[in-house]
Amino acid sequence: RTLDAFQDFMSATDAPWACWKAIDGSHAVRAQLEAADWLYHQICTALDCRPAAEQPKREWPLLPMEPLSQVRLDQALGEKEYRKQLKKCRKELAELHNELYRKKVPVVIVYEGWDAAGKGGNIKRLASALDPRGYEVIPIAAPTHDELARHYLWRFWERLPKTGHIAIFDRSWYGRVMVERLEGFCSEAEWQRAYDEINEFERELTDAGTVVVKFWVQIDKDTQLARFRERQNTPEKQWKITEEDWRNREKWDAYEEAVDEMLARTSTERAPWHILESVDKRYARIKAMRLVIGAIRQTLDR
């Protein structure tokens, strides 16, 4: 029975680019030599620049996404209504967080967006409703030397939440198809390949029962400029503005093109993108909380 099981999984997972080799282990030394010879043969074949074996094409059911230039940014929420909705959403999220823990359902929330769009404040309001023992906010900076020595998704796998916990990523693996693409930190072949890699990554998360919610926080160039100047002119906010922010602003059009492609190619049925219109930060905060509530309820009700 055990032998049949081994044969079944080897047949199911054998592929031209990752094939199994059965070795007779009845004679230890002969088995070692055969394994070494097989490994040597495979390495030599790879070094001879063998064309990569064609992998099966994966299909990702994608949702339509409108270009950022067409997103309406005139939505607003008054202070009184904001306070009312904030209190209500916090109560619902707190209750859902407890239920997530009891049912051992992990949640991954991704925040991407323009500099000064309001990601930090949005995360702060969302996290204020959660039990501190059951969530983590993970700010993503440039990869370390050790992280660069591995596949770019490795450092995100390392930070995924335990069952029943919530991970909030302040920037994420999508840097591969934005900043790394535009700043030349990876080749065109690498960032083109990344769309399928990311879709596969998120598919594996949702297959395992993880709730995945992705936000793009949207503002216009004029709003960004006003917020940059406010940061420059406010002593307690000056730490938020850097020369890199100004350099990125000069590449607005290139970034917008990259983001449009990212949204179009990675907004899947299981892990869709949501646009947070954040010219009015209060509106964006409540919208984010409602979307998280809806995504969690949808999973818990299955």
Name what the model sees in each region:
Residues 1-302:
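Glycine-rich phosphate-binding loop of ATP-dependent small-molecule kinases
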